[in-house]
């Protein structure tokens, strides 16, 4: 199997755009620093081409054995493609056991086929930072040292004392008082200089719109159930008293059911519909056809039966 079997052809369209964008993020300065760092630890030369020098995985596996001895027990020196891919897979597994984050890893094809050299560079920089965190001393200052946990153990007395402390972000309550505050229930004057309203002279009064609950009572309030007169100054209507109730509002004082009849007929009297003369079915005729409002009417027998229910 030839070494060109895994090589891809040129990219076009969106694939070419994505590849060019990844290549634009590749930093040659970081590559030079990684080259110096790897060659200084392993003692092996990478060569002029960074990708081709690390493609077989032998230098990377040697690097992991320097950082963590025995992490890659077998290194394949063969030029076969699957042997080189096996070396890269063993190197990636060794980085995981070394404590690398999964998001910082690269795939074997990213280096073997030069698919994403930017991710390879990011992974090697993260590996250098992890080695610096674990105390590795090298002649090249490369990588970012990871922060360490700062754990503190406090006893119960210290924890309880901390509950009485207010942090600086919360402000302070030292010498806190209510001096200068408006008294409860007093006036809070609203004024506007544009409307020529004078500023408040004191804080001891409260406006009518704000109300007050000081010495609150119902003096001057309209009695429940009394008349509330609605008037309009534009129409010339005058204000009335607050002691009467209109007919539309009803009347509930001394209400009872006296004078009401339940179950009986309610005769409606109208002179227009009560003609003088004889009426069929035994109804009274003449001037007495329609009884006066004060007289008791005579009802047909079926009215009497209806009243008996």
Swiss-Prot record:
PROSITE patterns assigned: CALPONIN_1, CALPONIN_2, CH
GO cellular component: actin cytoskeleton; cell-cell junction; cytoskeleton; extracellular region; focal adhesion; membrane; specific granule lumen; stress fiber
Modified residues (Phosphoserine): 138
Region Disordered, annotated ranges: 283-309
Tissue expression pattern: Heart and smooth muscle.
Keyword Phosphoprotein applies: yes
PANTHER family in the cross-refs: CALPONIN, CALPONIN-2
Protein's job: Thin filament-associated protein that is implicated in the regulation and modulation of smooth muscle contraction. It is capable of binding to actin, calmodulin and tropomyosin. The interaction of calponin with actin inhibits the actomyosin Mg-ATPase activity.
Name of the molecule in the record: Calponin-2
Species per Swiss-Prot/TrEMBL record: Homo sapiens
């Amino acid at each position: 199997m030839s070494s060109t079997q895994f090589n891809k052809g040129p990219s076009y369209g969106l694939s070419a755009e994505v590849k060019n964008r990844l290549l634009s993020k590749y930093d040659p300065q970081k590559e030079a620093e990684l080259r110096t760092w790897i060659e200084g630890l392993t003692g092996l030369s990478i060569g002029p081409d960074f990708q081709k020098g690390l493609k077989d995985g032998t230098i990377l596996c040697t690097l992991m054995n320097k950082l963590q001895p025995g992490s890659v027990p077998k290194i394949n020196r063969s030029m076969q493609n699957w042997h080189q891919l096996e070396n890269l897979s063993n190197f990636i597994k060794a980085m995981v056991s070394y404590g690398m984050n999964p998001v910082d890893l690269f795939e074997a094809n990213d280096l073997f086929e030069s698919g994403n050299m930017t991710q390879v560079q990011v992974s090697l920089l993260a590996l250098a930072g992890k080695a610096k965190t674990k105390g590795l001393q090298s002649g090249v200052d490369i990588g970012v040292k990871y922060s360490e946990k700062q754990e503190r153990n406090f006893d119960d007395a210290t924890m309880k004392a901390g509950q009485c402390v207010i942090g600086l972000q919360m402000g302070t309550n030292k010498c806190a008082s209510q001096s200068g505050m408006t008294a409860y229930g007093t006036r809070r004057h609203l004024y506007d200089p544009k409307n020529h309203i004078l500023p408040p002279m004191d804080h001891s009064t409260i406006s009518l719109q704000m109300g007050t609950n000081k010495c609150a009572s119902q003096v001057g309030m309209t009695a429940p159930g009394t008349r509330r007169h609605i008037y309009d100054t534009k129409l010339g209507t005058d204000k009335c008293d607050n002691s009467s109730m209109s007919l539309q509002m009803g009347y509930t004082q001394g209400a009872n059911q006296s004078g009401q009849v339940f179950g009986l007929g309610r005769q409606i009297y109208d002179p227009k519909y009560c003609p003088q003369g004889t009426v069929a079915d035994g109804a009274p005729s003449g001037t007495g056809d329609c009884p006066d409002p004060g007289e008791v009417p005579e009802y047909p027998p079926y009215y009497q039966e209806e009243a008996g229910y």
